[in-house]
C-alpha cells in the first residue's frame, strides 16, 4: 500500500499529479489527512477530501510514503 500524507497548505501539483498517475497505473494509494478535519486545503485553495484521517493510519510496513511539500 502507498500512503500520501496531506496537511493544510500542501502544494497541490506535488500531491495531485503523482496521485493521479499512480492510480491510473493501478497502484493502490490512500490519502491520509494530517491535522484533523474531513477536507484538507492546499496552498492555492484547492480542497481535497482525504481517504482516512491520520489517527487511522496503522500500517507498520507501507510500501511507500509520499510527503508533498507546501507551506502551513
Task: State what each model feature region is.
Residues 1-72:
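Extended, subdomain-level signal for the structured scaffold at the beginning of enzyme domains
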Amino acid at each position: 500500500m502507498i500512503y500520501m500524507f496531506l496537511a493544510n497548505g500542501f502544494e497541490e501539483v506535488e500531491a495531485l499529479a503523482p496521485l493521479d498517475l499512480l492510480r491510473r497505473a493501478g497502484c493502490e494509494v490512500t490519502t491520509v489527512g494530517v491535522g484533523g478535519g474531513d477536507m484538507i486545503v492546499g496552498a492555492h485553495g484547492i480542497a481535497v477530501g482525504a481517504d482516512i484521517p491520520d489517527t487511522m493510519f496503522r500500517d507498520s510496513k507501507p510500501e511507500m510514503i509520499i510527503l508533498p511539500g507546501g507551506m502551513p
